[in-house]
Curated annotation (Swiss-Prot):
Molecular function terms, GO-annotated: mRNA binding; structural constituent of ribosome
Keyword Ribosomal protein: yes
Keyword Ubl conjugation carried by entry: no
GO cellular component, one term: cytosolic large ribosomal subunit
This protein's name: Large ribosomal subunit protein uL13
Organism taxonomic ancestry: Bacteria, Pseudomonadati, Pseudomonadota, Gammaproteobacteria, Cardiobacteriales
Domain of life: Bacteria
């Protein structure tokens, strides 16, 4: 009789990946990042266990979108005060905080709850080409 393998949290081996976002499309990049963070690329993937890897994204300021989304895509947030709904389009968000656009896209693709928050903490985003995780010896990942 066959038994379904379930990964134990202690047995998960995590790797570090670095992705260069220069010239990449936002959605296609975000789906691959979310897939790596969840661990769906591994044969020992278990939905209720954090089996994902660490992902470093460099050159987040050079992420692109197709069509007219640079002006038409609007990001909203509310400060909590009455009448204080804030909005910014894609290009404004990229100027203010280059990594935030990718973070929002990936966050929407991860599970909601404590597991998704733990997986999102393994995402490291940098606007330039330098990152501070060279001690982990990340593997370059082409998308």
């Amino acid at each position: 009789m066959f038994k379904t393998y379930t990964a134990a949290p202690a047995s998960v081996e995590r790797e570090w990946y670095v992705i260069d976002a220069d010239g990449k499309t936002l959605g296609r990049l975000a789906t691959e990042v979310a897939r790596r963070l969840r661990g769906k690329h591994k044969p020992e993937f278990t939905p209720n266990i954090d089996t994902g890897d660490y992902v470093i994204v460099i050159n987040a300021d050079k992420i692109g979108v197709t069509g007219r989304k640079e002006q038409d895509k609007i990001y909203y947030h509310h400060t909590g005060y009455v009448g204080s709904m804030k909005s910014a389009n894609f290009s404004q968000m990229q100027q203010r905080n280059p990594g935030r656009v990718l973070e929002i896209a990936v966050k929407g693709m991860l599970p909601k709850g404590p597991l998704g928050r733990a997986q999102l903490k393994k995402l490291k985003i940098y606007a330039g080409s330098e990152h501070e995780h060279s001690a982990q010896q990340p593997t370059a990942l082409e998308i």
